[in-house]
Amino acid sequence: MEKLRLCLIFMLLFITSFSSVAHAIETRATHAILIDYETGLVLFEQNPDTLMSPASMSKLMTVLMVLEALDDGRISMSDKFFVSDDAWRRGGSKSGSSTMFLNARSRVSVENLLRGVIIQSGNDACIALAEGLGGSELGFAEMMTERARDLGMENSTFMNSTGWPDVDHKTTARDLAYLTKHLIKHHTSSYGMFAERSFTWNGITQQNRNPLLYANMGADGLKTGHTQESGYGLVASAEQNGRRLILVINGLQSKKERASEARKLMNWGFRAFTNETLATPDNVLVRAPVWQGEFAWVGLAPSKAFRVVLPRTGLRKMVVTASYDKPVLAPITKGVPVGKLRVTLPGLETQEIDLVTTANIEREGMLARALSAISYVIFGE
């Protein structure tokens, strides 16, 4: 380990000037995860990798499949999909489930179906989209599972497009959080639909069920879920002062409890932590010895701006270290990773970034290399 230079120490002294009350947090949710969008750091988790029934939160994967088909040019927002008798029977007004109130054998645009899924949680809209893209809902569900694997959602299996209870239809809070981050990052132009508070179809106006949209806390999505098996769940995201958090909770006992737990966890995440730039590529933090080079030392700096999540209190327990294999063998090319800069804090995952060389250094001449080798054997340096 190498001691960091004074410039980094000064940054830490500046950051430690923050003062607020950070405290432990608990939740009644059986499954929960709260992550920082920018860094991906987990701020809180409870059974995040335990399989659970996601109910209508599954529809986020359905939405992703549609948005990717739009991006690929396979469909357009104005394309009209057929509403089959099966879609109407299992997801329509007579089904007793969440519905967009589509008419059987009608044709509805992809754009309206998307809003029916996102805002109204319409099972009929999901099935119509699934049949239009996958030929059948089961075929579409297989596509959903395959795409989930591509995204690294190793614990997710989808048996339908709606989240209707099925013994094999499972996911985890962590997988849903990763899916949400992907949606926000790669589909910004469509993401605004998740913040729309109501949608009218067939003369019936339905309100968005996401309770955080009405809580004046910067929430702009995403999806609720509820079945008797799963309890009440929510995938939510909110942004305050340029900082975004993603929350997944499930297993609550009521709508009221879901809303209160979501507000509590999201507010805690914004109050208890801050995002800061610890170092930039302009900050040479370490001088590493060079072996058989024309210069004895090479500077090491972060490969890009090192953005970290820091608690607003308790920074005295923070440990910042730089590690690398030394000496660095010449010739050296600028920008090559040779080590890591790490930040360790109690209760949080280690945050790290590559340390890269800041200069090109040629090898020294043959005689000088021989003398360096002798010096290394005798003196170890």
Name every feature range the model reports, one short phrase each:
Residues 1-6:
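Positively charged n-region of N-terminal signal peptides that target proteins for export
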Residues 7-17:
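Bacterial N-terminal signal peptides
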Residues 14, 22, 44, 71-73, ...:
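Generic marker of residues within folded, mature protein domains
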Residues 15, 26-29, 343:
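Intrinsically disordered/low-complexity terminal segments and short unstructured peptides
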Residues 22-177, 181-185:
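Active-site-adjacent loops and short helices of periplasmic peptidoglycan-processing enzymes
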Residues 153-157, 165-381:
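Domain-terminus/edge residues, biased toward the C-terminal soluble/receptor-binding domains
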